[in-house]
A protein has these predicted regions:
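Active-site phosphate/pyrophosphate- and oxyanion-stabilizing loops and adjacent acidic/basic residues
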Residues: 127
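Conserved active-site beta-strand element of glycosyltransferases/polysaccharide synthases
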Residues: 139
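Flexible, glycine/small-residue-enriched loop-and-beta-strand segment within the central core
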Residues: 2-10, 22-117, 142-144, 148-158
Length: 159
C-alpha cells in the first residue's frame, strides 16, 4: 500500500489580484473581477464572466457562458449547466446560468440550464435547482424549493 504523500498546491496568480489553484481549467475568454479565488480542479468554461470578490471552491463546474455577479460563493462540486438537451454542441441552443451578486451556491448542488439565482439568495448544499430563485431567498432540496428568507437564514447563522 502506498503512503500518502503531501503535495504542494500550485498557485496561479491571475490579474486583478485574483488567484487560481492548479490544476484547474480556465476557458477561453474567461473574464474575472478583482480579488477572486478559484479552487483546484475547478472547471470554468469559455466565455464565463465572474464579478469581483467571488470564491469558486474546488471541483466546481461552471459551463460555458455562465455569469456570476460580485461576491458570489460557489461551493465544492457545485455544477452550473448550460445545455438543457445535451449534447447540442451548438451554443445557440445553450441557456447559461446567471448567479446574481451576493448569492451562495452550496457544495454539490446542480443548477439546470437557464436558471437565475437572485441577489443575496442561497441554494442549499446538494440541491437541484430547476426554477429561478428570487432575491433574498433560501432554497434547498431535490428539486429545490423555498425554505426561508435570507434574513431568517442570517439570524440562524448568528445563533
Amino acid at each position: 500500500m502506498a503512503e500518502d504523500v503531501p503535495q504542494q498546491s500550485n498557485r496561479i496568480t491571475l490579474e486583478k489580484d485574483s488567484v487560481a489553484w492548479a490544476p484547474c481549467m480556465l476557458g477561453e475568454n474567461f473574464n474575472h473581477g478583482k480579488k477572486c479565488s478559484i479552487g483546484a480542479l475547478a472547471h470554468i468554461g469559455r466565455n464565463v464572466t465572474i464579478g469581483d470578490n467571488c470564491r469558486i471552491q474546488g471541483s466546481a463546474y461552471i459551463a460555458d457562458g455562465c455569469v456570476l455577479g460580485d461576491e458570489v460563493f460557489v461551493g465544492p462540486n457545485a455544477t452550473l449547466l448550460n445545455d438543457k438537451y445535451p449534447p447540442s454542441g451548438d451554443s445557440k441552443y445553450w441557456k447559461p446560468v446567471t448567479v446574481e451578486s451576493g448569492a451562495v451556491i452550496g457544495g454539490g448542488s446542480t443548477i439546470i440550464p437557464g436558471c437565475n439565482v437572485g441577489k443575496f439568495s442561497v441554494l442549499g448544499a446538494g440541491s437541484v435547482l430547476t426554477k429561478n430563485i428570487p432575491e433574498n431567498q433560501v432554497w434547498a432540496g431535490n428539486p429545490a424549493i423555498f425554505v426561508m428568507n435570507r434574513s431568517e437564514y442570517e439570524s440562524k447563522r448568528e445563533q
